[in-house]
Amino acid sequence: KYVDIIIDELQDPKVDFVTGNNSLEKFDPVFGFHGFVPAGFKVTALKKICELKKTDNTETGYKEFFTSNKIFKTKFLLPEPDIIIPNEFRFALDYPEDFKLAKVIISNLGNNFSIRDILQFIQKNPHLEQIIEPVIKKWEKDYKKETSDFSID
Protein backbone atom coordinates (compact mmCIF):
# COMPACT_ATOMS: atom_id res chain seq x y z
CA LYS A 1 0.00 0.00 0.00
CA TYR A 2 2.64 2.54 1.06
CA VAL A 3 4.91 1.70 -1.86
CA ASP A 4 2.09 2.66 -4.22
CA ILE A 5 1.43 5.88 -2.29
CA ILE A 6 5.12 6.83 -2.40
CA ILE A 7 5.35 6.15 -6.13
CA ASP A 8 2.27 8.31 -6.72
CA GLU A 9 3.72 11.13 -4.58
CA LEU A 10 7.02 11.04 -6.49
CA GLN A 11 5.16 11.77 -9.74
CA ASP A 12 4.74 15.32 -8.41
CA PRO A 13 7.58 17.49 -9.76
CA LYS A 14 7.53 19.36 -6.43
CA VAL A 15 8.55 16.24 -4.46
CA ASP A 16 12.07 14.72 -4.31
CA PHE A 17 11.75 12.49 -1.24
CA VAL A 18 8.84 10.79 0.56
CA THR A 19 8.83 8.88 3.84
CA GLY A 20 6.60 8.09 6.79
CA ASN A 21 6.77 10.39 9.80
CA ASN A 22 4.80 11.57 12.81
CA SER A 23 4.77 15.17 11.59
CA LEU A 24 4.18 16.90 8.28
CA GLU A 25 6.83 19.49 9.16
CA LYS A 26 9.91 18.05 10.90
CA PHE A 27 11.54 14.64 10.43
CA ASP A 28 11.73 12.38 13.50
CA PRO A 29 14.26 9.55 12.96
CA VAL A 30 13.11 7.57 16.01
CA PHE A 31 9.43 7.44 15.09
CA GLY A 32 8.37 3.79 14.94
CA PHE A 33 6.38 4.17 11.74
CA HIS A 34 9.67 4.11 9.81
CA GLY A 35 10.00 0.40 10.29
CA PHE A 36 6.83 -0.04 8.26
CA VAL A 37 7.05 2.57 5.54
CA PRO A 38 9.65 2.56 2.82
CA ALA A 39 11.23 5.80 1.75
CA GLY A 40 11.24 6.87 -1.84
CA PHE A 41 13.38 9.35 -3.68
CA LYS A 42 13.98 10.49 -7.21
CA VAL A 43 17.16 9.39 -8.95
CA THR A 44 17.95 13.04 -9.68
CA ALA A 45 17.88 13.82 -5.95
CA LEU A 46 20.14 10.88 -5.14
CA LYS A 47 22.61 11.95 -7.83
CA LYS A 48 22.64 15.46 -6.39
CA ILE A 49 23.39 14.12 -2.89
CA CYS A 50 26.22 12.00 -4.28
CA GLU A 51 27.70 15.07 -5.95
CA LEU A 52 27.36 17.38 -2.93
CA LYS A 53 27.90 15.21 0.15
CA LYS A 54 31.11 15.60 2.10
CA THR A 55 31.29 12.08 3.54
CA ASP A 56 31.65 8.56 2.22
CA ASN A 57 29.80 7.11 5.21
CA THR A 58 26.14 7.43 4.32
CA GLU A 59 24.74 4.27 5.91
CA THR A 60 23.24 5.63 9.13
CA GLY A 61 20.67 8.36 8.78
CA TYR A 62 20.54 8.57 5.00
CA LYS A 63 17.04 10.11 5.16
CA GLU A 64 18.49 13.21 6.77
CA PHE A 65 20.40 14.00 3.57
CA PHE A 66 16.96 14.76 2.15
CA THR A 67 15.33 16.26 5.26
CA SER A 68 18.08 18.39 6.86
CA ASN A 69 18.43 21.02 4.17
CA LYS A 70 16.33 23.16 1.84
CA ILE A 71 17.71 21.69 -1.39
CA PHE A 72 15.25 18.81 -1.58
CA LYS A 73 11.49 18.95 -1.52
CA THR A 74 10.36 16.45 1.10
CA LYS A 75 6.91 15.06 1.76
CA PHE A 76 6.00 13.14 4.90
CA LEU A 77 3.27 10.54 5.12
CA LEU A 78 1.42 10.34 8.40
CA PRO A 79 0.19 6.99 9.63
CA GLU A 80 -3.52 6.43 9.43
CA PRO A 81 -5.14 7.94 12.56
CA ASP A 82 -6.17 4.59 13.99
CA ILE A 83 -2.66 3.13 13.67
CA ILE A 84 -0.75 3.60 16.90
CA ILE A 85 2.78 2.22 17.00
CA PRO A 86 3.76 1.22 20.54
CA ASN A 87 7.01 2.88 21.66
CA GLU A 88 8.24 -0.39 23.15
CA PHE A 89 8.41 -1.99 19.69
CA ARG A 90 10.53 -1.37 16.65
CA PHE A 91 9.98 -2.84 13.22
CA ALA A 92 13.23 -2.15 11.40
CA LEU A 93 15.78 -4.90 10.72
CA ASP A 94 19.02 -3.49 12.12
CA TYR A 95 19.86 -6.07 14.79
CA PRO A 96 19.54 -9.85 15.24
CA GLU A 97 16.71 -9.23 17.73
CA ASP A 98 14.79 -7.32 15.05
CA PHE A 99 15.14 -10.29 12.72
CA LYS A 100 14.05 -12.67 15.47
CA LEU A 101 10.86 -10.64 16.00
CA ALA A 102 10.25 -10.49 12.25
CA LYS A 103 10.58 -14.28 12.01
CA VAL A 104 8.00 -14.72 14.80
CA ILE A 105 5.61 -12.33 13.07
CA ILE A 106 6.02 -13.94 9.65
CA SER A 107 5.77 -17.48 11.00
CA ASN A 108 2.43 -16.55 12.59
CA LEU A 109 0.97 -14.22 9.98
CA GLY A 110 2.43 -15.63 6.76
CA ASN A 111 3.73 -13.52 3.90
CA ASN A 112 0.69 -11.34 3.24
CA PHE A 113 -0.30 -9.11 6.16
CA SER A 114 -0.92 -5.48 6.98
CA ILE A 115 0.35 -3.10 9.63
CA ARG A 116 -2.95 -3.60 11.43
CA ASP A 117 -2.40 -7.37 11.44
CA ILE A 118 1.03 -6.91 13.04
CA LEU A 119 -0.28 -4.49 15.65
CA GLN A 120 -3.14 -6.85 16.56
CA PHE A 121 -0.67 -9.73 16.79
CA ILE A 122 1.68 -7.89 19.17
CA GLN A 123 -1.25 -6.69 21.27
CA LYS A 124 -2.29 -10.32 21.72
CA ASN A 125 1.32 -11.32 22.42
CA PRO A 126 2.82 -8.64 24.69
CA HIS A 127 5.62 -11.02 25.69
CA LEU A 128 7.18 -10.33 22.27
CA GLU A 129 8.41 -7.04 23.70
CA GLN A 130 11.08 -9.06 25.52
CA ILE A 131 12.66 -9.96 22.17
CA ILE A 132 13.09 -6.38 21.07
CA GLU A 133 13.48 -4.50 24.35
CA PRO A 134 17.29 -4.89 24.54
CA VAL A 135 17.83 -3.02 21.28
CA ILE A 136 15.48 -0.06 21.71
CA LYS A 137 18.00 2.06 23.66
CA LYS A 138 20.94 0.49 21.81
CA TRP A 139 19.56 1.70 18.49
CA GLU A 140 19.09 5.24 19.79
CA LYS A 141 22.66 5.26 21.14
CA ASP A 142 24.11 3.74 17.96
CA TYR A 143 22.13 6.11 15.78
CA LYS A 144 23.52 9.15 17.59
CA LYS A 145 27.05 7.72 17.52
CA GLU A 146 27.08 6.53 13.90
CA THR A 147 24.94 9.10 12.16
CA SER A 148 26.44 10.34 8.92
CA ASP A 149 27.65 13.89 8.40
CA PHE A 150 24.78 15.40 6.40
CA SER A 151 26.76 18.42 5.27
CA ILE A 152 26.43 19.17 1.61
CA ASP A 153 28.12 21.87 -0.44
PLM regions: where:
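Conserved core of the sugar-phosphate nucleotidyltransferase
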Residues: 1-89, 100, 104, 120-153
